[in-house]
């Protein structure tokens, strides 16, 4: 073991305690030996778990049944309208502070701060989350959390608009450009949890939208299952 690696593990033990230390050591061992790569497969077989009709009929209670359950004031909000206008034209609020224009054809794997593009053909276990050349990986994770969907849904709820085409379009674009278990967006389970929660929120909100077809639903459910 290199002295640098030894120091890293020593610092983890000192700062996080023995329980996390052994968890981390096991994780690194499985990552470097390829065990995790075998556990988290790529190109999984397409399966149908539940149909859209069945889901609508039997879905577990969520925060709400669909958008009609949200009894919000039906009034214009110019600030919210401007925010959504920026979002649907490719600009995203980063870390609830800085707006960055990514464009409408963003690849979901390029760090807008450094311009570094991750290799989406690599298994996530081969992607380094700390890389000076790549920069802070959270710049890639930020849009992939899909928290930018909430202002869009808020506007739809307040003003009786329907941006389901944009919302499902963004989700399907992510799925198409992020093969299962490949690239930086599968690296962190916390990021995955946030993304899945936000997708499910959108599914419930737009559950009766014409844009939510059987094909769209199956693609989203398949991706959720394998994340």
Where do the language-model regions lie?
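Eukaryotic compositionally biased low-complexity/IDR segments
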Residues: 54-69, 74, 78-80, 93, ...
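Short coil/turn segments at secondary-structure boundaries
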Residues: 25, 98, 186-189
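Aromatic-lined, polymer-binding surfaces characteristic
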Residues: 120, 127-130, 134-227
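Low-complexity, Ser/Thr/Pro/Gly-enriched N-terminal "stalk/linker" regions
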Residues: 79-125
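Membrane-proximal basic amphipathic "stem/tether" segments
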Residues: 1-59
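Intrinsic-disorder-associated interaction segments
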Residues: 2, 11-18, 22, 69-81, ...
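Exposed alpha-helical structural elements
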Residues: 5-8, 79, 83, 166, ...
């Amino acid at each position: 073991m290199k002295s640098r690696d030894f120091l890293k593990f020593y610092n983890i033990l000192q700062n996080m305690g023995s329980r996390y230390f052994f968890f981390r050591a096991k994780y690194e061992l499985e990552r470097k030996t390829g065990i995790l790569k075998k556990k988290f497969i790529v190109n999984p077989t397409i399966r149908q778990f539940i149909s859209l009709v069945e889901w609508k009929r039997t879905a577990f209670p969520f925060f709400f049944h669909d958008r009609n359950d949200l009894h919000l004031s039906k009034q214009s909000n110019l600030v919210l309208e401007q925010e959504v206008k920026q979002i649907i034209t490719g600009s995203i609020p980063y870390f609830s502070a800085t707006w960055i224009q990514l464009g409408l054809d963003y690849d979901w794997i390029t760090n807008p701060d450094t311009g570094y593009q991750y290799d989406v053909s690599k298994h996530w276990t081969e992607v380094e989350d700390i890389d000076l050349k790549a920069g802070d990986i959270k710049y890639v994770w930020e849009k992939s959390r899909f928290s930018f969907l909430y202002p869009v849904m808020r506007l739809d709820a307040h003003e009786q608009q329907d941006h389901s085409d944009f919302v499902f379009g963004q989700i399907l674009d992510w799925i198409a450009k992020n093969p299962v278990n490949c690239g930086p967006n599968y690296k962190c389970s916390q990021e995955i949890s946030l993304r899945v929660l936000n997708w499910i929120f959108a599914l419930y909100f737009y559950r009766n939208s014409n844009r939510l077809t059987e094909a769209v639903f199956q693609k989203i459910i398949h991706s959720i299952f394998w994340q």
